[in-house]
């Protein structure tokens, strides 16, 4: 501390004295400083610093206590200071001069003391504030500790209230912390401000004070910062825990609300599920009102639920929620409850509405049922009939059903919908039960219609049963009557037959009774049906008529048999009686000596027998007449041997008549002999008596024969039959009368010879004889007329039965029969019936004419035939009308028969069409099931042939349809319009289906043709790719050996000759492939289909372009002399080209893994023979290419040779494909001949060359396989067409089992060809001889090999695949090197042809003749059999002609020309030398002509032996080919 500044600043100060005050640890030193006239007090030292506040409250308190003591001690010095001031005042008063000084000293000293005291007071105040600050800090720290303890202690709460209390505690702690913190901050601010003010009020140069202030402020700030850090950290934890607790509280509150809402919804849902829909309409209305109230209330709860859901959504959006899953589940639960509640509310509303409709309908139903019940009571009292009552009951029952149907249906619908809540529909069930009970009760009262319907059903069932029995019986009778009646058998057999017919007659009567019962039942049924006409069904009438006809036939046959049997029995009895009487009259003579009684007895007995004989005889005669009459009425062929039977009966009757006359004579003689013994007078008297009696009887008979009224012959059959029976009964009497007259005449003659006077009785006798004669004539006439009249009426009655109106009605209404058999049967019956009617009509007409002519005789004046004549005329008219109608009916039946036949033909056509369509669909389906591997070209062509077969079947079906259409059009006028329309519509429908199917077949065939064409073009493209790839490889390979620019130039020109004409053609094929693929498969699929081949084409073109560039670069490099580098580049290019050549194998379909696995042994052997490596290249090719080329190379044209050729392999040695005829290729292919090498080494070279081709330019799938070519070269190349524009358009010959070479430019497909080439001048002679053996040797070995494999060379597919030939470039020599000895592979059928081979031009998509098997050269031994066979296909089917040496070949005794399907052959059982020569098979159709040729060589029995090595090679090839063929056909 210092005093105020003196005005004399520059005056020095001097410390006069110092005062030290100490209290405890506190100490101050006060110095008295004098400066001029000024005296001041200065705080020289203060311990601790005046602004030191301590580090804690205890320290502060101690400092405050010490400061209080220090201040108290300083206060104690105040009196001394004031005493000193008073002394100064006294001194000043004493020393007036120094008064100012003393005044000044007194003034400064007082101020200094006051300042010192004030400073110390302020320090005390500072320490007091510091103590308060530390107290607040302590309280703040204690609060912090309490809050931390609160946070650290676990808090358990069981309810939201406890959680809310806990949150309040959090809030309180937070609030208290904030309050304490604020208090502390205020205290710290107050203390800091006080220190700053204290520091500012002190001397500014007092560094200790400043340091003390800084130290104190630092302590304050440190403590404050420490506490605030704790508070902030604690506040953070408090906030975090409070947030968590708030979330928990929010969840708890949400759960509480959710539980509340869920409880309400669950309770309401249970109520909705359990509440009934009401038991009455009023109850239902009340429930509907409550439901509407519940709907209003539910809206409030829906709002609460939506609020909960929004809260849940907000909670779920928070990042630090730990119970999201629980909340989500609860939220989902709320959603489910809300959905279920909404569904139940909607269902409840709908169910209540439905229940309301149900109860409304139920009330209406109850009203209707009440009315029905009243009406039923009224009907019971009326007593209606069953039909009327049934109609009423049915109407009431319908009304009951209709009135209750709606209610019951609504109830059932409601119950089915509320089936899961049975309690809700209890009232519905009860109401429905009441309705049903009442309906059942009323239905039990309304049973008349059911009884009526049951009765009708029973009647219908009975009718059906009766009709079924009738039909069965009619069928049995029809079968029996279909046989011819044989009446000429023995009586026992006849009786058996009669018994059968009698049983059949009984059956017919029973059937008639059944039919009558059915008719009665039907009539009764019709009577019950008030709205229907009471008519018999047509079926019943038809059966009744047919049964009547059959019954008449049965009765007729029974009658015939009965009459015949009775006649036979009666004739036998008559014969016995005749013999007995004859024996009596011959043996028994009346003796005179016998008693009269005995004679009389014998006479009476004989007379009785005689009378019985007469009766039996005339009865037999009547039976015979009746039998003859019945036979005459029989149908044609109904009775077996009719004429014979009639003749037999007539003979029997004639015999009986003769016997009766003879017996009459014997009887008369016996009587005369008996009278001889009597006296004359007695005899005379007896004579007179007998004459009188006989005369009387004759007169009586005359009166009988002359009735008063004329006899009308036009009566009915019954009257005529009665009259005839009476007449037959009179015949014995008439015969007896005749016998009496004859006896009188005999006795007259006897008596006249004995002298008896007879004159008186002569006149009488004469009159008697005359009258009797007249009577005899009349009796005969009467008997004849009566017999014919009865017969006439019998025939008339039979005709009446046949042509009665009912029969005509049936004829006018022909039945609708189902089939032609029924119509034909009906037509036969009608024709038979008409023939029978015509026969009876002719018989009746004949009888009527005879009767009328007989009546016109004088003796028949008392017989009238007018009525009979009228009946005859009416019968003739009726018969004519009936016959006309019968003919019309037969015409109708004939039309029906034709209609049925046509309909059946149409049905057969439909069945044929269905069968064709089914088989065609199966064909398509089976083809579609085949995988891509199986759908090769051969399968496709076979499919096309099958489709063509079905197309031919369709054409044949069309021809049949045309015939049926013509038949319909010819007879359409005879059909009814509806039937004709039916047939026409059926044919039109069939024609429509056939046309549609024909279009399908045509489209399918067109699709197959396009597919075939597409495959062929693709195979041609692949073939070109293989050639191009192989050529690129060879050119690249040869270019590496070129050392001069001229050699490379020659090689380049040769390569350009190959590329230039073929690439545009290949691009045309590519375009055709794309076009065909798009046409077949659509735009996108077609592009995908052609993508591979287009990509491969691009790769080939790139390789060609790269090769050309490499050759150009090579020429440039050769000019610069940089050969090794160029060769290295070409080696790389050569490797890439080989890879490109192998690449197409991955696109092929068929693999030969089986061939490789099955044929490893054979492949190893052939590989050893061929000397090839595993990669397919010859071993020597890589080691000594120059050496092989020098031995096997081709000679360049002279204009291309130069002196530098020795430095490079000839460019022509690349074996390029044949080029078009150019100046550089002077020889045409047809002018070239190839001699085939015969050695095994040449064959090995062929095979190794083939392996090199397949290994470097093939598929790359079977490098170790020797014989089978890659699938791309085989399976795809069969059935090629004939026209090709370049080498790449024509297929290459095949390498068959025999090592033959086929010319590719000759005019025919021949397997024996030769090539004349020049040996290069630089080629060694021995090498040339090895490469080109003599022609004769090659021919012999070639033909010998052919002979051994001839049987198989044209059979197996694999052998055809192995067929290869030497491909020679124009102007180049033959080469057997592997790079040139084998040319391109062809299809599996061995049928490759070039453009000039057959002189035919057809398109690739055509169907010109095509050889699937060619002729091959063959050499046979004389006397051996031989077969030349080809297989040709095409459409139309080609005609094949055989030629030998230009002459047409025909079959004779020496040879046979055979043809089966597509195979044609010439077979010579024994070959002779004359058979040798050129054989040509020429196939021709409208699409083209094709020929195949072969040479037959005939050798003697001393032919050249086959060397062992050739035989081994042949066996190896044959075994290999057989194994591969077997594998391919599995």
From Swiss-Prot:
PROSITE patterns: IG_LIKE
Biological process, per Gene Ontology: brain development; centrosome localization; cerebral cortex radially oriented cell migration
GO annotation, cellular component aspect: centrosome; cytoplasm
Major subcellular location class: cytoplasm
Post-translational modification: Ubiquitinated and degradated by the CDC20-APC/C pathway. During brain development, CDC20-APC/C complex degrades CCDC141 after centrosome translocation into the dilated area. CCDC141 is restabilized in the dilation until the centrosome enters the dilation, at which point it is once again immediately destabilized by CDC20-APC/C complex. The oscillatory regulation of CCDC141 protein is needed for proper cortical migration. Phosphorylation at Thr-91 by PLK1 affects CCDC141 degradation.
Keywords of the record: Coiled coil, Cytoplasm, Cytoskeleton, Immunoglobulin domain, Phosphoprotein, Ubl conjugation
Protein's cellular compartments: Cytoplasm; Cytoplasm, Cytoskeleton, Microtubule organizing center, Centrosome
Region annotated Disordered, chain positions: 1153-1240, 1259-1285, 1324-1356, 1369-1403
Source organism superkingdom: Eukaryota
Segments of skewed composition (Polar residues): 1334-1345
Residue intervals of the Ig-like domain: 1409-1497
InterPro entries attached to this UniProt entry: Ig-like_dom, Ig-like_dom_sf, Ig-like_fold, Ig_I-set, Ig_sub, Ig_sub2, IgLON_domain, Spectrin/alpha-actinin
SUPFAM superfamilies: Immunoglobulin, Spectrin repeat
Residues with PTM Phosphothreonine: 91
Positions annotated as Spectrin repeat: 49-127
Pfam families: I-set (PF07679), Spectrin (PF00435)
Annotated coiled-coil segments of the chain: 220-251, 758-785, 865-967
Known partners and oligomeric status: Interacts with DISC1. Interacts preferentially with phosphorylated forms of myosin regulatory light chain (MRLC). Interacts (via the N-terminal region) with HDAC6; inhibits the deacetylase activity of HDAC6. Interacts with KIBRA (via the C-terminal region); retains AMPAR in the cytosol after internalization.
Role: Plays a critical role in cortical radial and GnRH neurons migration during brain development. Regulates cortical radial migration by negatively controlling the activity of histone deacetylase 6 (HDAC6) and promotes centrosome maturation. CAMDI is required for dilation formation of cortical neurons during radial migration. Plays a critical role in learning and memory performance through regulation of AMPA-selective glutamate receptors (AMPARs) cell surface expression in competition with KIBRA.
Protein name from the UniProt record: Coiled-coil domain-containing protein 141
Organism: Rattus norvegicus (Rat)
Gene that produces this protein: Ccdc141
């Amino acid at each position: 501390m210092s005093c105020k500044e003196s005005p004399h600043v520059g005056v020095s100060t001097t410390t006069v004295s110092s005062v030290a005050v100490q209290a405890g640890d506190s100490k101050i030193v006060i110095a008295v400083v004098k400066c001029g006239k000024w005296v001041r007090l200065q705080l020289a030292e203060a311990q601790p610093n005046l602004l030191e506040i301590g580090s804690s409250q205890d320290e502060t308190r101690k400092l405050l206590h010490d400061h209080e003591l220090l201040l108290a001690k300083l206060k104690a010095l105040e009196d001394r200071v004031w005493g000193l001031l008073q002394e100064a005042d006294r001194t000043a008063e004493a020393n007036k001069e120094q008064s100012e000084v003393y005044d000044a000293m007194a003034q400064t000293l007082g101020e200094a003391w006051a300042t010192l005291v004030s400073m110390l007071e302020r320090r005390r105040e500072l320490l007091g504030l510091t103590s308060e600050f530390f107290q607040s800090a302590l309280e703040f720290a204690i609060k912090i500790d309490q809050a931390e303890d609160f946070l650290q202690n676990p808090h358990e709460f069981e309810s939201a209230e406890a959680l809310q209390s806990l949150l309040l505690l959090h809030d309180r702690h937070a609030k208290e912390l904030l309050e304490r913190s604020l208090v502390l901050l205020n205290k710290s601010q107050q203390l800091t401000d006080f220190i700053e003010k204290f520091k500012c009020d002190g001397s500014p140069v007092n560094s200790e004070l400043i340091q003390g202030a800084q130290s104190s402020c630092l302590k304050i700030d440190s403590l404050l910062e420490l506490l605030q850090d704790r508070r902030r950290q604690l506040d953070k934890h408090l906030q975090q825990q409070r947030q968590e607790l708030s979330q928990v509280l929010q969840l708890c509150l949400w759960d509480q609300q959710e539980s509340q809402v869920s409880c309400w919804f669950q309770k309401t849902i249970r109520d909705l599920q359990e509440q009934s829909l009401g038991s009455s309409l009023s109850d239902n209305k009340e429930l509907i009102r409550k439901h509407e109230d519940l709907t209003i209330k539910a809206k409030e709860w829906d709002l609460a639920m939506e609020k909960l859901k929004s809260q849940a959504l907000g909670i779920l959006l928070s990042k630090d929620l730990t119970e999201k899953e629980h909340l989500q589940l609860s939220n989902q639960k709320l959603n489910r409850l809300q959905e279920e509640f909404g569904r139940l509310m909607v269902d409840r509303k709908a169910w209540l509405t439905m229940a309301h409709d149900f109860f409304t309908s139920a009330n209406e139903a109850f009203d209707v049922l009440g009315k029905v019940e009243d009406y039923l009571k009224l009907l019971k009292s009326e007593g209606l009939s069953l039909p009327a009552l049934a109609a009423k009951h049915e109407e009431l029952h319908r009304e009951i059903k209709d009135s209750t149907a709606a209610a019951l249906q609504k109830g059932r619908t409601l119950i089915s919908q509320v089936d899961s809540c049975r309690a809700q529909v209890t009232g519905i069930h009860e109401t429905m039960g009441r309705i049903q009970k009442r309906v059942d009760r009323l239905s039990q009262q309304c049973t008349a219609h059911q009884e009526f319907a049951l009765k009708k059903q029973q009647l219908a069932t009975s009718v059906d049963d009766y009709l079924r029995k009738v039909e069965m019986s009619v069928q049995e009778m029809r079968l029996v009557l279909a046989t011819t009646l044989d009446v000429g058998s023995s009586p026992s057999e006849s009786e058996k037959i009669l018994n059968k017919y009698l049983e059949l007659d009984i059956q017919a009567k029973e059937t008639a009774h059944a039919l009558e019962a059915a008719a009665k039942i039907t009539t009764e049924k019709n009577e019950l049906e008030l709205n229907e006409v009471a008519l018999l069904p047509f079926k019943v009438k038809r059966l009744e008529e047919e049964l009547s006809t059959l019954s008449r036939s049965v009765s007729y046959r029974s009658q015939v048999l009965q009459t015949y049997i009775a006649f036979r029995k009666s004739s036998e009895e008559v014969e016995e009686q005749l013999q007995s009487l004859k024996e009596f009259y011959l043996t028994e003579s009346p003796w005179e000596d016998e008693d009269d009684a005995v004679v009389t007895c014998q006479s009476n007995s004989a007379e009785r027998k005689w009378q019985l004989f007469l009766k039996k005889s005339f009865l037999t005669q009547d039976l015979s007449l009746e039998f003859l009459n019945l036979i005459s009425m029989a149908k044609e062929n109904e009775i077996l041997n009719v004429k014979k039977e009639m003749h037999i009966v007539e003979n029997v009757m004639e015999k009986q008549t003769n016997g009766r006359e003879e017996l009459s004579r014997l009887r008369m003689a016996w009587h005369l002999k008996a009278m001889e013994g009597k006296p004359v007078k007695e005899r005379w008297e007896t004579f007179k008596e007998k004459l009188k009696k006989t005369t009387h009887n004759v007169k009586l008979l005359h009166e009988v024969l002359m009735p008063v009224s004329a006899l009308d012959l036009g009566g009915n059959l019954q009257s005529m039959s009665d009259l005839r029976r009476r007449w037959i009964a009179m015949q014995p009497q008439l015969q007896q009368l005749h016998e009496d007259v004859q006896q009188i005449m005999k006795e007259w003659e006897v008596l006249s010879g004995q002298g008896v006077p007879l004159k008186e009785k002569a006149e009488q006798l004469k009159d008697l004889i005359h009258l009797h004669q007249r009577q005899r004539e009349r009796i005969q006439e009467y008997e004849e007329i009566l017999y014919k009249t009865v017969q006439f009426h019998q025939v008339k009655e039979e005709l009446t039965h046949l042509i009665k109106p009912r029969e005509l009605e049936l004829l006018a209404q022909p039945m609708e029969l189902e089939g032609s058999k029924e119509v034909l049967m009906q037509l036969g019956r009608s024709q038979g019936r008409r023939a029978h009617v015509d026969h009876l009509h002719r018989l009746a007409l004949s009888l009527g004419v005879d009767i009328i002519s007989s009546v016109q005789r004088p003796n028949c004046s008392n017989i009238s035939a007018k009525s009979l004549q009228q009946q005859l005329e009416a019968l003739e008219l009726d018969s004519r009308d009936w016959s006309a109608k019968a003919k019309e009916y037969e015409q109708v039946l004939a039309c029906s028969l034709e209609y049925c036949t046509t309909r059946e033909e149409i049905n057969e056509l439909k069945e044929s069409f269905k069968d064709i369509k089914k088989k065609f669909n199966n064909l398509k389906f089976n083809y579609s099931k085949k995988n891509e591997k199986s759908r090769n070209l051969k399968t496709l062509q076979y499919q096309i042939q099958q489709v063509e077969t079905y197309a031919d079947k369709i054409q044949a079906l069309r021809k049949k349809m045309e015939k049926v259409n013509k038949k319909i059009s010819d007879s359409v006028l005879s059909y009814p319009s509806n039937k004709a329309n039916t047939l026409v519509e059926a044919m039109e429908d069939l024609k429509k289906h056939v046309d549609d199917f024909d279009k399908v077949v045509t489209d399918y065939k067109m699709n197959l043709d396009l597919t075939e064409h597409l495959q062929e073009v693709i195979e041609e493209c692949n073939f070109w790719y293989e050639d191009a790839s192989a050529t690129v490889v060879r050119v690249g390979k040869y270019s590496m050996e070129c050392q001069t620019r001229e050699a490379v130039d020659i090689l380049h020109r040769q390569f350009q000759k190959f590329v230039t004409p073929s690439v545009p053609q290949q691009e045309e094929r590519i375009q055709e492939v794309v076009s065909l693929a798009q046409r077949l498969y659509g735009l996108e699929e077609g592009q995908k289909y052609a993508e591979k081949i287009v990509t491969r084409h691009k790769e080939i073109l790139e390789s060609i372009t790269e090769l050309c560039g490499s050759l150009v670069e090579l020429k440039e490099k050769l000019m610069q002399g940089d050969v090794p580098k160029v060769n290295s580049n070409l080696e790389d290019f050569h490797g890439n080209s080989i890879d490109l050549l192998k690449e197409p194998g991955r696109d092929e379909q068929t693999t030969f893994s089986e061939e490789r696995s099955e044929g490893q042994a054979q492949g190893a052997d052939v590989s050893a023979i061929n000397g090839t490596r595993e990669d397919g290249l010859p071993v020597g090719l890589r080691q000594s290419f120059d050496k092989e080329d020098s031995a096997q190379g081709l000679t360049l044209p002279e204009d291309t040779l130069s002196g530098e050729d020795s430095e490079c392999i000839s460019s022509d040695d690349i074996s390029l494909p044949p080029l078009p005829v150019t100046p550089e290729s002077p020889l045409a292919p047809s002018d070239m001949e190839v001699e085939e090498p015969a050695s095994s080494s040449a064959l090995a070279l062929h095979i190794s060359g083939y392996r090199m081709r397949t290994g470097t330019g093939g598929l790359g799938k079977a490098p170790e396989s020797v014989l089978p070519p890659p699938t791309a070269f085989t399976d795809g190349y069969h059935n090629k067409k004939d026209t090709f524009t370049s080498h790449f358009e024509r297929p290459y010959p095949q390498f068959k089992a025999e090592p033959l070479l086929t010319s590719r430019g000759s005019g025919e497909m021949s397997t024996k060809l030769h090539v004349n080439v020049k040996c290069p001048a630089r080629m060694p002679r021995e090498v040339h001889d090895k490469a080109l053996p003599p022609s004769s040797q090659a021919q012999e070995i070639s033909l010998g090999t052919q002979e051994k494999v001839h049987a198989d060379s044209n059979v197996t597919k694999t052998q055809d695949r192995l067929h290869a030939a030497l491909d020679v470039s124009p102007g180049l020599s033959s080469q057997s090197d592997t790079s040139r000895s084998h040319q391109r592979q062809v299809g599996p059928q061995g049928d490759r042809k070039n453009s000039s081979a057959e002189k035919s031009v057809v398109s690739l998509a055509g169907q010109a003749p095509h050889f699937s098997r060619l002729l091959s050269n063959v050499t046979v031994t004389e006397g051996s059999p031989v077969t030349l066979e080809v297989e040709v296909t095409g459409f139309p089917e080609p005609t094949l002609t055989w030629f030998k040496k230009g002459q047409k070949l025909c079959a004779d005794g020496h040879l046979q020309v055979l043809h089966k399907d597509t195979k044609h052959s010439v077979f010579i059982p024994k070959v002779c030398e004359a058979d040798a020569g050129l054989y040509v098979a020429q196939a021709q159709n409208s699409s083209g002509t094709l020929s195949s040729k072969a040479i037959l060589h005939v050798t003697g029995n001393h032919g050249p032996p086959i060397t062992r090595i050739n035989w081994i090679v042949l066996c190896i090839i044959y075994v290999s080919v057989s194994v591969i063929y077997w594998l391919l056909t599995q």
